[in-house]
Amino acid sequence: MEKTKIVFMGTASFSKEVLVNLLENDYNIIGVVTQPDRYVGRKKVLTMPEVKEVALEYNIPVFQPANIKNDYQSIIDLQPDLIITAAYGQLV
């Protein structure tokens, strides 16, 4: 039986914990959708979401649409069986 293809959507540090748990339990995460990198602090350091850091560590494709309502085709193209959302930050 083929593994379920999962797209994960999340941004907050809580989301990172959910994603790590899925990966450690051998779920088939085929893509991660998260908010775009943001400038943080007084020095305006460009910072990526923690979820993106985890995805890159596991060589999972990352998608960072500014507005998911206008840019969802890349998710559809992955043909996921399931989408899991945890604190994504936009209405889906």
Predicted regions and their residues:
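One-carbon transfer enzymes
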Residues: 1-92
